[in-house]
Amino acid sequence: MKIALITDTHWGVRNDAHHFLDYMAKFYDNIFFPYLEDNRIDTIIHLGDIVDRRKYINFVTLRHLKDTFLNKVTDKGIDLHVIIGNHDVPYKNTNEINSMQELFDKHDVSYYSEASTVNFGDTPICLMPWINNSNYAQAIQHMKDTPAQILFGHLEIAGCLMMRGQINEHGMDVGDFSKFDLVASGHFHTKSVTKNIHYLGCPYELTWSDYQDPKGFHIFDTDTRELEFVRNPYRMFNKVFYDDSGKEASDILEKDFSGFEGSYVKVVTQNKENPYWFDQFMDKLYQANPVNIQIVDDHLNLNLEDDSDIVNEAEDTVTILSKYIENMETNVSKKRLDNLMRSLYNEALYMEV
């Protein structure tokens, strides 16, 4: 039996921005559901954070969620299971009130706010929602008692990659899940593997942190117990490097920007010797109708040829802030202050300016 795994879909991201809804629809209309139909897959497990806002939902976003996902699931006779994530609940200490129960309790959808073991074919799988104070004891006991060797959940595990270049230092220990042959989880938006823990990542780019990070969904085969990654080719964030030194006009002005419509674009100017060419270059880029264009001048002449060079030349924002907190003179717990800073930073990433 093959099961489609998808997680962290975050409907309503960036203040319910319409261009993100359009971008998400392309993925579901052209990639996700056609793949399931072509491969005769009729079961989906969503590993949490189906919506973005914790306390309410925009009606336009709700209609989009129904039209692009839930109605198609119903029309195609797909068996949908949703694990409750931290963005699906308004309170930090309980999953009792959650988006799936309040919005879709009349739909034929199975959702899990407490740890459960469900048989998919002949394979028992432990489904683990977001763990908080109210369900912690039940979650731990269920993991001990379950006969399942596979666990799917929405977990915060220390020692795993939170985003590229940043390891999560908080949450449960990797060893807490050692009894399972395979653990697949949502919550962190970048794909990673730590021992038997597989973070699946979100299906599309939501912030600049996702730039050039592989996005998509997975297929789990209950017979082989293997995960297959299906990549989403659509991108929301793009970078263009401008350098007219020693170039002909045609080299600069014949670039193809047709794929940039509805996306965010950063133009990194390394050498700008001909202002007229640059103006023409920018005019052509604007005609492609991107959502936002940001120009970044490489005024330090760092000769940064690609994005890996840029990353290697600078510390990330969280590291800089953590070092600042570490060097502060304060009576407040620096660990608690650092945790608060990281939480606020992650929240800010998803706010539309």
Predicted region positions:
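Structural motif
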Residues: 3, 43, 123-124, 150, ...
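Accessory, non-catalytic peripheral segments of nucleic-acid enzymes
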Residues: 222-353
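Conserved beta-sheet core of the metallophosphoesterase superfamily
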Residues: 163-228
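Core catalytic region of metal-dependent phosphoesterases/phosphodiesterases
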Residues: 2, 9, 13-117, 176-178
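Active-site environment of divalent metal-dependent phosphoester hydrolases
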Residues: 10-14, 52-55, 82-94, 118, ...
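Short, conserved loop/helix-junction motifs that constitute active-site signature segments
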Residues: 73-76, 142-145, 174-179, 259-260
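Conserved catalytic scaffold of divalent metal-dependent phosphoesterases
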Residues: 65, 88-175
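Divalent metal-coordination and catalytic microenvironments
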Residues: 8, 28, 44, 49, ...
